Amino acid sequence: MATVNQLVRKPRARKVAKSNVPALEACPQKRGVCTRVYTTTPKKPNSALRKVCRVRLTNGFEVTSYIGGEGHNLQEHSVILIRGGRVRDLPGVRYHTVRGALDCSGVKDRKQARSKYGVKRPKA
């Protein structure tokens, strides 16, 4: 236990919280250009071909972003919006592509959870 005199001379150091999404720089989303669109395989118990893209952001960061939903229209030089949110079974993927924003289209024929995949309400 520090004495009062020690604390007067050198106060207690505050713990600095480290961000899980440093490339966003405290913004809710960031815009970027796809430099590579590819598939990758997940970690051990799971098996699939996950769709991801490498993105060069407007602030100069280059990050890997997951493309959620069934099917996408992204290719190299597509301009996309990314948000935070990691993919647990893909190491190094800490961002998600926002569907239905900029060049990334919404998921075709999506009926449920539409807002997460950028789909307008269907005409009844």
Curated annotation (Swiss-Prot):
Q: What does this protein do?
A: With S4 and S5 plays an important role in translational accuracy.
- Which Gene3D superfamilies did the record assign? Nucleic acid-binding proteins
- What's in the GO CC field? small ribosomal subunit
**SUPFAM superfamilies, sorted:** Nucleic acid-binding proteins
Q: Which organism is it from?
A: Escherichia coli O6:K15:H31 (strain 536 / UPEC)
Family from the record: Belongs to the universal ribosomal protein uS12 family.
For this UniProt record, the keywords arranged alphabetically read as follows: Acetylation, Methylation, Ribonucleoprotein, Ribosomal protein, RNA-binding, rRNA-binding, tRNA-binding
Q: Decide whether keyword ATP-binding is in the record.
A: no
- Cross-referenced InterPro entries: NA-bd_OB-fold, Ribosomal_uS12, Ribosomal_uS12_bac
One molecular function GO term is: tRNA binding
Could you confirm whether the keyword Transcription regulation appears in this record?
Answer: no
Annotated positions of the N6-acetyllysine modification: 108
What interactions and quaternary structure are annotated? Answer: Part of the 30S ribosomal subunit. Contacts proteins S8 and S17. May interact with IF1 in the 30S initiation complex.
State the protein's name.
Answer: Small ribosomal subunit protein uS12
Which residues are annotated as modified residue 3-methylthioaspartic acid in the UniProt record? 89
Example GO BP: translation
